[in-house]
C-alpha cells in the first residue's frame, strides 16, 4: 500500500496518518526526517544536502527525490509507505512518475477553509504542561485558564487567524495544484496510475478514520 496524503494545514492529516500506518503496517515518510537521517548517516546525498542547508539554501528536488528512492528500498517499506509532506509541488510529483515510483492511492482530506480557521484559531495552550484546549470543542472550565493550575492559556502565533489564513493561501497556491495533477493522472487510466480519493475531513476523528480506511480498502 503506497499512499500520498494531501490536505490543508489543520485538515487532520497527522491523526489519519497514524491510523493508516497502523492498519497497513507501513512507515510514514517525511522529507524532514529523511533529510535529518541522511545527514546524520553521512550518505553522499546527505552530505550534499547538508552543504546546501548549512548555506541557508533550499534542498533541490533532485536531492529530495534521490533520498526518497533510497528510503523506499529499505526493509520497512516492504508493505509500502505513506508519504507525508511529499510531493509538495508539480515538478516533484512529475519526477516521481518519471522515476517509476508507483503510488496506489492519493488521499485528500477535504476540509472547508473556514472550518480549518475555526479549528486552528480556537486552540489555546498551557505552555508549562503542553495541555491543549479549544474555545469551542474542548473549552477549559474557566475561560482562558488552565483547568489544573489556573494559569493563563495562550494562543500560539501559528494559530492566530491571520497566520492561519496565510498558511491556507500558501497551500492553495503551492500544494492545491497537486490535487488536480493526481486527479488528471487517475482519470488517464494507465495501469500504474494511482486511485484518487477525496474524503470529507469533518465529523469525529473515528468517522474520518473509517472513511479513509474504507476508501483504501475499496
UniProtKB/Swiss-Prot annotation:
Binding-site positions, AMP: 31, 36, 57-59, 85-88, 92, 156, 167
Reaction catalysis annotation: AMP + ATP = 2 ADP
Subcellular locations according to the entry: Cytoplasm
Pathway info: Purine metabolism; AMP biosynthesis via salvage pathway; AMP from ADP: step 1/1
GO MF term list: adenylate kinase activity; ATP binding
Keyword flag rRNA-binding: no
E.C. code: 2.7.4.3
Record protein name field: Adenylate kinase
Species whose genome carries this gene: Alcanivorax borkumensis (strain ATCC 700651 / DSM 11573 / NCIMB 13689 / SK2)
Organism classification: Bacteria, Pseudomonadati, Pseudomonadota, Gammaproteobacteria, Oceanospirillales
Amino acid at each position: 500500500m503506497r499512499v500520498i496524503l494531501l490536505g490543508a494545514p489543520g485538515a487532520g492529516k497527522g491523526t489519519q496518518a497514524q491510523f493508516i500506518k497502523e492498519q497497513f503496517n507501513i512507515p510514514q515518510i517525511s522529507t524532514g526526517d529523511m533529510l535529518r537521517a541522511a545527514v546524520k548517516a553521512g550518505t553522499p546525498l546527505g552530505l550534499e544536502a547538508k552543504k546546501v542547508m548549512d548555506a541557508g539554501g533550499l534542498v533541490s528536488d533532485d536531492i529530495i527525490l534521490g533520498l526518497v528512492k533510497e528510503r523506499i528500498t529499505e526493509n520497512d517499506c516492504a508493505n509500502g509507505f505513506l508519504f507525508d509532506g511529499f510531493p509538495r509541488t508539480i515538478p516533484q510529483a512529475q519526477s516521481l512518475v518519471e522515476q517509476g515510483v508507483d503510488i496506489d492511492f492519493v488521499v485528500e482530506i477535504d476540509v472547508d477553509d473556514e472550518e480549518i480557521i475555526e479549528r486552528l484559531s480556537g486552540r489555546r495552550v498551557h505552555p508549562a504542561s503542553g495541555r491543549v484546549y479549544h474555545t469551542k470543542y474542548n473549552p477549559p472550565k474557566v475561560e482562558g485558564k488552565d483547568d489544573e493550575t489556573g494559569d493563563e492559556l495562550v494562543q500560539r502565533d501559528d494559530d492566530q487567524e491571520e497566520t492561519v489564513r496565510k498558511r491556507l493561501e500558501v497551500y492553495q497556491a503551492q500544494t492545491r495544484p497537486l490535487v488536480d495533477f493526481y486527479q488528471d493522472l487517475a482519470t488517464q487510466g494507465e495501469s500504474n496510475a494511482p486511485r484518487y480519493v477525496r474524503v470529507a475531513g469533518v465529523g469525529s476523528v473515528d468517522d474520518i478514520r473509517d472513511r479513509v480506511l474504507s476508501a483504501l480498502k475499496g
